[in-house]
Amino acid sequence: MVEESRYEDSGAPVINPSTLLARVIVRQIVEAGITDVVISPGSRNAPLSIAFHQASVKGLIKLHVRIDERTAAFFALGIAKASGRPVPIVCTSGTAVANYHPAVLEASHTNLPLLVLTADRPASLRKTGAN
């Protein structure tokens, strides 16, 4: 999101680096011809979730939101099987990623294309017990 209270010398809004990176990732995914994405929303993957939502509003990608990561991953696997196209699954950090594991194994053994995008906590919070 744009931080409206801070501006560069040019008067243009300063964009958070995570937001900028998320927009680049989404643009590359859309340009690769990927048509669907499945998101399990969380605080750490908010920039990706927002960028995918913005692409969805513009009609560039079909957004599917599933709160439960296991459900999300298997739902994406079904889309990949039906379409033959890669399907990104997006989640936050920590144990959320582990919940994708069964579907990722299934995708690997059946040669179905899943693209796993996960967010991580800031470096300053790694190995501190912050969850």
Positions of PLM-derived features:
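N-terminal alpha/beta PP-like core and its mobile active-site loop of ThDP/TPP-dependent enzymes
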Residues: 2-131
